[in-house]
């Protein structure tokens, strides 16, 4: 059996060895990996534009992700621009985060985002792996 390829560190040549990944898909994966700050789950492949679901499943069976490599964003210190750059953070959410901590207090937990008055419901499971409340917080600690 071929060794699993780790998605957060693989370069395009390594990605091309995975069945289901051609040059376009390798480029797409690296582009989105940079936008996200890393992948926390192989099923995120299904979210990526330009990768068909059946292809995502073929790829997913041959790759792993090292979640310790995911870049975290501190909701208490990140600027609006830093927040909104993340694909899962809408302009509305970024604005509310900055407003909340400006008017009230720093966030004590990422779960407090659920109390913000947002037009669109948050997809917590997608968002939580990328967010922390303190830049020094141990990123391995679960927020569930």
Model-identified regions with their sequence ranges:
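Compact, charge-rich alpha-helical regulatory domains located at protein termini
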Residues: 42, 109-115, 121
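Extracytoplasmic
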Residues: 1-2, 10, 24, 40, ...
């Amino acid at each position: 059996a071929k060794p699993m390829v780790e998605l957060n560190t693989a370069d395009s040549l390594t990605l091309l060895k995975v069945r289901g990944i051609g040059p376009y898909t390798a480029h797409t994966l690296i582009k989105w990996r940079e936008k996200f700050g890393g992948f926390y789950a192989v099923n995120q492949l299904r979210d990526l534009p330009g990768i068909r679901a059946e292809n995502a499943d073929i790829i997913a069976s041959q790759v792993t992700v090292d979640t310790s490599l995911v870049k975290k964003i501190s909701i208490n210190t990140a600027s609006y621009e830093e927040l909104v750059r993340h694909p899962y953070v809408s302009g509305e959410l970024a604005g509310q985060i900055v407003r909340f901590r400006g008017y009230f207090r720093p966030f004590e937990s990422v779960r407090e985002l659920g109390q913000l008055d947002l037009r669109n419901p948050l997809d917590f499971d997608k968002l939580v792996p990328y967010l922390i409340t303190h830049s020094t917080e141990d990123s391995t600690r679960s927020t569930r």
